[in-house]
Design a protein with these regions (language model features):
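Bacterial N-terminal signal peptides
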Residues: 13-27
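Intrinsically disordered, low-complexity polar regions and short flexible loop motifs
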Residues: 32-236
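Intrinsically disordered, compositionally biased low-complexity segments in eukaryotic proteins
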Residues: 2-4
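N-terminal export leaders
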Residues: 8-9
Length: 236
């Protein structure tokens, strides 16, 4: 068969030979492009605002599963098997309201849903942030801060000085109880943006999510403190 294929191409012009190659191998290309890789991801969900009536499909052919969200903690753990993006839908309208593309290297994810503002009339309602939630990235006894506040923040975590970058900051070891005080500069004035205390039990870790102020013009950021034990249920 290989000799016959070479003879066919040799007897044609260069341009025709290229067309013949495309025709011969096109079915393989189409099949490769139409079959995206399946991923297996375990994940939890947190919404920056109260949300209900959300579902997702764990696997092709299965019924939609409701997502149970907590106001101050990660949701229960769910599992997804399929191609990306992972889609979250409205239970009533069945429309897709959030999408998450989880990188291949992440198998334990935290999905943070932040409502789009202003709220769109149709289409996606949330911006979705995907975080590596594995114990490898953040071990017990540490605090990570996700700065989505829109401010440049600096201050102290316990007795350690810190300056936060935008996005997810590296985890830092903390004592069982650590005060967190963060400030920002507005019009040459240093203003307190956040103050709180993180208290951990043995084997726990914390993620502090900082969001833009609720009131326009305020320097006080909104916050969500999420405490859990890696690989186990969350603590409300």
């Amino acid at each position: 068969m290989a000799h016959a294929r070479r003879s066919l191409i040799a007897g044609l012009g260069v341009g025709t030979a290229l067309v013949a190659l495309v025709v011969l191998f096109a079915p393989f290309v189409v099949r490769a492009e139409s079959a995206p890789a399946e991923q297996r991801v375990r994940f939890t969900v947190v919404s920056a605002r109260a949300a209900a009536g959300l579902t997702y499909i764990p696997r092709i052919g299965q019924a939609a599963t409701p997502l149970v969200l907590y106001p101050t903690a990660r949701s229960p753990r769910y599992e997804y098997r399929g191609a990306m993006p992972l889609r979250i839908t409205d239970a009533v309208t069945k429309s897709v309201i959030a999408e998450a593309t989880v990188p291949l290297e992440i198998t334990e994810a935290l999905l943070l849903l932040v409502p789009l503002d202003p709220a769109p009339a149709a289409g996606l309602r949330y911006q979705t942030y995907v975080l590596d939630d594995s114990a490898v990235r953040q071990a017990a006894g540490t605090l990570s801060i996700l700065n989505l506040s829109g401010f440049a923040l600096a201050g102290t975590v316990g007795d350690r000085a810190t300056s936060l970058a935008t996005g997810l900051n590296p985890p830092v070891p903390i004592a069982r109880s650590a005060a967190v005080v963060l400030r920002t500069t507005v019009k040459n004035r240093s203003l307190q943006a956040y103050a709180g205390t993180v208290e951990l039990r043995r084997g726990e870790r914390a993620l502090l999510v900082l969001l833009p102020p609720f009131y326009r013009g305020s320097a006080e950021v909104q916050s969500r403190l999420l405490i859990d034990s890696p690989g186990s249920a969350t603590r409300p």
